[in-house]
From Swiss-Prot:
Keyword Secreted: yes
Valine amide carried by residues: 8
GO CC annotation: extracellular region
Organism of provenance: Schistocerca gregaria (Desert locust)
Tissue specificity annotation: Found in the abdominal ganglia and perisympathetic organs. Sometimes detected in the subesophageal ganglion and thoracic ganglia. Not detected in the corpora cardiaca, corpora allata, hypocerebral ganglion or frontal ganglion.
BP-aspect Gene Ontology terms: neuropeptide signaling pathway
Coiled coil: none
Pfam families with a match to the protein in the record: Periviscerokin (PF08259)
Name this polypeptide is given: Periviscerokinin-2
Length: 8
């Protein structure tokens, strides 16, 4: 995941 996104 990225800084502003959940780890999906």
């Amino acid at each position: 995941g990225l800084l502003a996104f959940p780890r999906v």
